[in-house]
Amino acid sequence: MNTRMKIMLLPLWALLVAAWGACPAQDLLITEFMASNDDGLRDEEGESSDWIEVHNSGLEPVNLDGWYLTDSAANLRRWGFPPAIIAGGEFLVVFASGKDRRDPAGPLHTDFQLDADGEFLALVSPAGEIVHEYSPEYPEQQTDYSYGLGQSVTVFPMVGSQ
């Protein structure tokens, strides 16, 4: 391949690499959260902290290093994940306790708590792009009720069924 051809294909190659790298981002979602936890899930200290569930709906693992959770549209890089892997199909609970714990070997805690009256909540990629959000804010929350995405079910009728 001559030099001119290589130069012409370079932008296409860069575009393909960028698109491939962006694919896992679409697989991460905030699937559920609880902004007023009294009698629900407890953290490692036995406290009923608010929590956020992140789901990797894809097949490939995603390294969370450089990803962020935020409750502020003005500060998209509010709380950064440590270098941790979330496998394809896996769920990860992060406590929104204000304790700011990022040890990948232990439970994760954001440096903010969730507001039961409703607020902005987002998952942000290492590139600073919002991947999933509750915007402009999620609705007022009831104590001990989680909020999030519903589980989708597809029903296919059986051939010959009535």
Q: Which role does the model predict for each range below?
A:
Residues 1-6:
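N-terminal secretory signal peptides that target proteins for export/translocation
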Residues 9-19:
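Bacterial N-terminal signal peptides
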Residues 23-154:
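Activation on beta-sandwich/Ig-like modules and their edge loops
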Residues 155-162:
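A flexible loop/linker signature enriched in serine peptidases of the S9 family
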